[in-house]
């Protein structure tokens, strides 16, 4: 009997934990992320690691930027992870640990560390994960794992987003060291950055539309007040 979770099972679990509707453009983002994580987690070769967690957390936070209300955003993230039958607190904790690490060291050191050519105190267990990945021919690579690695580089050098040549060089070194498919990873990161820009533009357009609607409502409200005031004055004059 096959007990593997289906996409439908994952979605049901998600909506069990998060019962409120998801706003407009963000709904598609969550649907795609939910399905992507499902397909990764049910794969027989899937194994959780903190770098994947960082990718999930980063992708969620970036694509959900500006979401309101904030408490719903937290609920959506928790349900996203619970839908995969995993612990959202572990994802957040492991992601923060890597972010804190990257915030303390230089760009060259973080790259050397990821490439297994430099040791950093108290991070042996993380480097063991990377080494195991490099030696595992069945490692389940994913776009979210790639985003996690890229996020570490981005934290120490924000110019990587703008400087494609520099970004490509660093990512190629990582691919060679961890035995990852270079073409696939580079394409995934380029697509990720492109999607971030597209969502940011959609969010900006939505905010402009909402602002215009707000101004129209305020104008109509002011016109009603003026009309009412004018009517009252006319009535007083006739008396």
UniProtKB/Swiss-Prot annotation:
UniProt feature coiled coil, ranges: 158-216
Leader sequence segment: none
GO CC, any one term: plasma membrane-derived thylakoid photosystem II
Swiss-Prot/TrEMBL GO biological process terms: photosystem II assembly
Keyword annotations of the record: Coiled coil
Ranges for region Disordered: 217-239
Described purpose of this protein according to its UniProt entry: May be involved in photosynthetic membrane biogenesis.
HAMAP family the UniProt entry points to: Thf1
Family to which this protein belongs: Belongs to the THF1 family.
PANTHER family to which the protein is assigned, alphabetical: PROTEIN THYLAKOID FORMATION 1, CHLOROPLASTIC
Protein name, entry field: Protein Thf1
Gene designation per UniProt: thf1
